[in-house]
Amino acid sequence: MTILYLTFGDKTEFHVQAYLSMLSFRRQMTHDDRIVMVTTAPQLYRHMEQWAEVISIDDRQIEAWQGAHHFFWRAKIKAIEHVSRLYPEDDILYLDCDTILYGDINMLKQPLAEGSGLMDENEGHPSGMKTKTLRMWRTIAGRTYDGITLGMQHNMYRAGVVGIPHKKATEVLNTALALCDGMLTDGAERIVIEQYSLSVALYERAGLKETYPVIAHYWASKDYWIQAGLELMARVLLTGATPEEEMRMYEALDLSQLPIYVYKSNTARRLKTLVGRMFKDRDVRYIQKRT
């Protein structure tokens, strides 16, 4: 199985999350598994090159992957397609950076080997969702793309995890791209289009199963995980840890103490902002630049 990540830019937080996620899979990998990072910042993955393959892309590649409608997240589908072509005999498991393997990796490998697709949690049908997603659905409801007429049987799955069996990869990805481009051509709301395209393509061409709770997607509690990742990276750097020692450090983390979901009150956020404005830091001093 090829375990795939895609990162853009040089914001440290994204790459720290990717690092943690990669380690969570590395500890259960066998000789026929590989980790592939597709990134615009390959220099941030030099340390991981000891146990992961890094594929460098640039802004021109991303722009090409966005397609004629310049839809940024179409690049996710194209990145999966690119790696699938590099490793046509491998099942592909794409992951967002803010994911972590909690359960047994074989619970992911088995359905892929049986020809079933995988995605994160089933969110339900877009007709019952909030404003922008609902507007998207109203535009595309009943329309036909690549021989598929969109209906109430087509639920939306979170795309933080996308698993594609290798024998069906070409068909699934061609269908996902046709859905994505067709919806964009028809003027659908430019939100979660790639997510819905992958959901429908996998449902129709491979069948679809959820990966939660084998994989946790902590999109609503990132700060806790970023801090844990930074502390781990610091220990690895400061101790000059070998890959084996690094893995033991990761295994020593008590991940059960890190929340995978936190509801943050808007009122608390507004009050914190207000207090910050009323009681600003004073007498702030800096080291002077040398002339």
What role is predicted for each listed range?
Residues 1-66, 85-88, 261-264, 268-291:
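N-terminal anchoring/stem segment of glycosyltransferases
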Residues 65-75:
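A short, glycine-/small-residue-rich helix N-cap motif at loop->alpha-helix starts
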Residues 138-153:
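Short, flexible, basic/aromatic active-site loop/helix in glycosyltransferases
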Residues 149-240:
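Catalytic core and acceptor-binding pocket of nucleotide-sugar-dependent glycosyltransferases
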